[in-house]
Curated annotation (Swiss-Prot):
Protein's recorded name: Sulfate adenylyltransferase subunit 2 2
Organism listed in the record: Shewanella sediminis (strain HAW-EB3)
Reactions the enzyme catalyzes: sulfate + ATP + H(+) = adenosine 5'-phosphosulfate + diphosphate
The family this protein is said to belong to: Belongs to the PAPS reductase family. CysD subfamily.
EC number: 2.7.7.4
Its biological purpose: With CysN forms the ATP sulfurylase (ATPS) that catalyzes the adenylation of sulfate producing adenosine 5'-phosphosulfate (APS) and diphosphate, the first enzymatic step in sulfur assimilation pathway. APS synthesis involves the formation of a high-energy phosphoric-sulfuric acid anhydride bond driven by GTP hydrolysis by CysN coupled to ATP hydrolysis by CysD.
Keyword Nucleotidyltransferase: yes
Gene Ontology molecular functions: ATP binding; sulfate adenylyltransferase (ATP) activity
Enzyme class, first EC level, given as a word: transferase
Keyword Metal-binding: no
InterPro entries reported in the protein's UniProt record: PAPS_reduct_dom (IPR002500), Rossmann-like_a/b/a_fold (IPR014729), SO4_adenylTrfase_ssu (IPR011784), Sulfate_adenylyltrnsfr_sub2 (IPR050128)
Keyword set, alphabetical order: ATP-binding, Nucleotide-binding, Nucleotidyltransferase, Transferase
């Protein structure tokens, strides 16, 4: 076994230990399933952690109504294939208002449909711990967040008041109404994720692989035209380009990258030469300075 495989096995063991710890320690945990590559790895790890039994907590998808069509199809296929309990939540107030990224802007859309939608769902089901697939290498505010990220009764995160974590000892004490966000993939990198997906044969949406797709260049970002709701502005032209996505979210807010990587080994090779964060394609991260940290302090994942 190579050193890198051993490294991945160590990361796998750490993540599985965290999942088992949460399942034993908390009354009502849930796993946030956003259908991306990190969520796919989390699902795979959860199935391993509790094999041959069933995953002892539900998976939940906060649906903004603007996800890529393929993501929704993939989500439903995985739920049927693996038989896990799936909760899908859409913010009813946002749906009634017709909130969307084009009509209300990216910041308001994200706040109402993602942040408020997530808080609604957590309160509705009384979850006291929620797994997420965030990693420290993704973004600077996530780099300083603990594996067990304490949230108050309003789901807010205080980056100046985080609990110490010594080695693999986690403090899960919460009072009524408080909760913990748990990040088992904290110490993984994007390259680790892709190598693990390849070695374990984990199924992922084909949006991660390069293919000819209809895109519009807007403010320097390639936006895929995923359905008829995408407005084409004056002077814009829809072109078919070989693109793939390094991260997945609401399609109008997720930029594609030009790429020829059509297989997992080609993606891994591309990652070895890449010097930019995968979240460079997330429009919401550029709403304002410190945008992600502000969102997390308001309750965003």
């Amino acid at each position: 076994m190579s050193k890198y495989q051993t490294h991945l096995k160590q990361l796998e063991a750490e993540s599985i230990q965290i999942m088992r710890e949460v399942a034993a320690e908390f009354d009502n945990p849930v796993m946030l399933y956003s259908v991306g590559k990190d969520s796919s790895v989390l699902l795979h790890l959860a199935r391993k952690a509790f094999y041959p039994g069933k995953i002892p907590f539900p998976l939940m998808h906060v649906d903004t109504n603007w996800k890529f069509k393929e993501m929704i199809d993939f989500r439903d296929k995985m739920a049927k294939k693996h038989g896990f309990d799936l909760i899908v939540h859409k913010n009813p107030r946002g749906m009634e208002m017709g909130v969307g990224p084009f009509t209300h802007g990216s910041a308001k859309h994200t706040d109402i449909m993602k942040t408020e939608g997530l808080k609604q769902a957590l309160d509705m089901h009384g979850f006291d711990a929620a797994f997420g697939g965030a990693r420290r290498d993704e973004e600077k505010s996530r780099a300083k967040e603990r594996v067990y990220s304490f949230r108050d009764s309003k789901h807010r995160w205080d980056p100046k008041n985080q609990r110490p974590e010594l080695w693999n000892i986690y403090n899960g004490k919460v009072d009524k109404g408080e909760s913990i966000r748990v990040f088992p993939l904290s110490n993984w990198t994007e390259l680790d994720i892709w190598q693990y997906i390849y070695l374990e044969g984990i199924e992922i949406p084909s949006l991660y692989l390069a293919a000819e797709r209809p895109v519009v260049e807007r403010d320097g970002t390639l936006i895929m035209v995923d359905d008829e709701r995408m407005p084409i502005e004056e002077g814009e032209k829809v072109e078919n380009k070989m693109v793939r996505f390094r991260t997945l979210g609401c399609y109008p807010l997720t930029g594609a990258v030009e790429s020829q990587a059509q297989t997992l080994p080609e993606i891994i090779q591309e990652m070895l030469l890449c010097t930019t964060s995968e979240r460079q394609g997330r429009v919401i991260d550029n709403d304002s300075a410190g945008s992600m940290e502000k969102k997390k302090m308001e309750g965003y994942f």
